[in-house]
């Protein structure tokens, strides 16, 4: 039996990918590393996926964010930026693609999804997997972080409208 290279390397689950592609909606690709979060809007094309817009958590520096780029609030804000960029490009809906990440309740990938949804993109999701507002606004880290999240969100809103 022939096995695809990316499957052998443990990088792609083709069964999940096919299910996402059948929806014919733009995929909201959320990837996390130890330092950053990345949110991309990808469209399927026969010669390879086309990334319509992309956002990485290090962009938050531009809006005055000086905290970690890999925590739950920064994941939410990165999703919010990506959602606003996608709206500017004419994308109004999408479907979440978390790749090989395990879908755990309250995970950072779902915080990014909440940011995309709050930006105005129509995305199907269950409320039970989204982190609580206290975690999204960083109250579990520091009480003053909630005001910083609101401040950054306001700056993003000013830039993207």
Please place each PLM-identified region on the residue numbering.
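Ribosome-associated RNA-binding proteins
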Residues: 1-161
